[in-house]
Amino acid sequence: MNEIKDTDSKKSEEYEDDFEKDLEWLINENEKSDASIIEMACEKEENINQDLKENETVIEHTKQHSDPDKSLQDDVSPRRNDIISVPGIQPLDPISDSDSENSFQESKLESQKDLEEEEDEEVRRYIMEKIVQANKLLQNQEPVNDKRERKLKFKDKLADLEVPPLEDTNTSKNYFENERNMFGKLSQLCISNDFGQENVLLSLTNASCEENKDRTILVERDGKFELLNLQDIASQGFLPPINNANSTENDPQHLLLRSSNSSVSGTKKEDSAAKIHAVTHSSTGEPLVYIPQPPLNRKTCPSSAANSDRSKGKGKYNHRTQSARISPVTSTYCLSPRQKELQKQLEQKREKLKREEEQRKIEEEKEKKRENDIVFKAWLQKKREQVLEMRRIQRAKEIEDMNSRQENRDPQQAFRLWLKKKHEEQMKERKTEELRKQEECLFFLKGTEGRERAFKQWLRRKRIEKIAEQQAVRERTRQLRLEAKHSKQLQHHLYMSEAKPFRFTDHYN
């Protein structure tokens, strides 16, 4: 334990005062100490197991060789008295044997428990010492330098850009203007009692009718009334041309207004327009019976369709953006036949353009593929030509080398080589013939003299073969040296043939 403490103190002095390094050092030291403690515990357990095995063998031996004398028991008991106390054994009493076994097992368990408790106490004590040392080291450390550059940096603000909410001023102005125009106009309303018709009658004089054409009109949508500018409706193309054939006979006194569920804010110009029908009065001023006329286009928008301007009729005003009040669905229930035809034509044009674009992309891909194939084929042909050219050049070089060797070779030397090869071939043939004859004669040789003679001949033949091989190797090396020397001489002559009399060469730089 003292040695471990000394090593820990030395290592702590060697480290710098960096907090992160000290933490890593403490963690590593704790791991090492834990590993050493575990090894010590394992060694102790092994020693205990060995002692227990020895005790068991001794007890079995005493059971097998039990004597009335107690000399053996006296010898065994002092040796193992520190761990197990073996009781006296009677050879013919099975009950005493079982009692002794039980007592032995109990003593074994108690000894194991004591050892485990001692080991746990040692481990706890060692860990507490290490914790105290670590706390002392942390207390003795200098405070952390705040000016040191940190690895992790955080921003003061998470959001770099904050966008303020939009205020829809135009909608609020229109709302207040509609509220002012609605004041005092509800007394002039006359709603028809016919079921299934959503019509509103306005009983106005001629002057008021002309004024309303310049100003506003009351429109009903799903049981809600709104004041809208007549010029805006006419400019958007929602009002059909009014038939003024009977205007000289009967002046229009009442206007029957019918509107669809579409918004008049200008976002959807393909919605159905409000239908205005002139209803005549009698000359006496008494109103006639008002029969509501059905619209020309019977495919009206149902009441369940999405209405984007329902919030206008309510007293509460929601400050929301314009995109939130626009319904994403474009309904075709309230479109006129002409508008439907135009829509179909637009869809056909879009489909046609889309098909043309797809066809153009397919053609471009085919063209690119064709160009790539052409380029690849050209590159492959070029590579083949290069390979063939390289082979042709290599073959020409080999032929030139062979010709140069044949030209530069001495005829006398070639004759000598040929003669030598012939001589070697003849020698080989003679040797093979002699060997064959010797093999035939071995059958007739008898006694030690014949065997010794054959062995000597075999040794002589082996020596001759070895000498011939050495001579052949020497001749081959000499020939290679001569060829190398000749090639160097040729290179030197070629280099010297290039005359460079007017060139200055500085040999010192």
Curated annotation (Swiss-Prot):
GO molecular function, one term: microtubule binding
Start-end of Basic and acidic residues biased regions: 60-82, 338-367
Annotated localization: Cytoplasm, Cytoskeleton; Cell projection, Cilium, Flagellum
Keyword Transmembrane: no
Top-rank lineage group of the source organism: Eukaryota
Disordered as annotated region, ranges: 60-121, 285-367
Biased composition (Polar residues): 320-334
InterPro entries: CCDC181 (IPR026687)
Alphabetically ordered keywords of this record: Cell projection, Cilium, Coiled coil, Cytoplasm, Cytoskeleton, Flagellum, Microtubule
Any one cellular-component term (Gene Ontology): manchette
Entry coiled-coil feature ranges: 335-375
Protein role: Microtubule-binding protein that localizes to the microtubular manchette of elongating spermatids.
Subunit-level organization: Homodimer. Interacts with HOOK1. Interacts with HOOK2. Interacts with HOOK3.
Similarity annotation: Belongs to the CCDC181 family.
PANTHER family: COILED-COIL DOMAIN-CONTAINING PROTEIN 181
Name assigned to this protein: Coiled-coil domain-containing protein 181
Organism: Macaca fascicularis (Crab-eating macaque)
Gene that encodes the chain: CCDC181
